[in-house]
Amino acid sequence: MDKFELSFTLNGQDITRTVPTDARLLDVLRYDCRCTGTKEGCGEGECGACAVLLDGLPVNSCLVPAFQADGCCVETVESIAREFAAKLNATGTSQCGACTPGIVMTARWLADHPEVLGQTSLREFMSGNLCRCTGYDGVIEGVDAVVSGKK
């Protein structure tokens, strides 16, 4: 199997790993970098559990070939301040937790780009993050609290 040297910034730290040429960013993060907060839900880019920020943009890491992250900045749920996740949890945003990392990363991006909500509703924006437990009301309330700065 062919391999290549992948260098990128992960949660503010420069790293280099030798990975298979067909590796997904998700696998590099979980198995080579031990960022296990990034979850694989569907493996097809439909559920959002594997969402990370790649050069500041939310992406489903299960769909990103690892080589596309070469020279980029990747931010995972491990980099998010505990207070940020605590705000989401305080509203009952998650139950089983499988979707939580992706929701946190999407909410993190949205908190930095609230102007997006002038173009679309919060519920519509979060539709890329599937949750089988909550019925979404808690998710929407939690993300709204984080984005708007409510307690």
Regions flagged by a language model, labelled:
Residues 1-151:
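Signature of N-terminal electron-transfer/Fe-S-associated modules in redox systems
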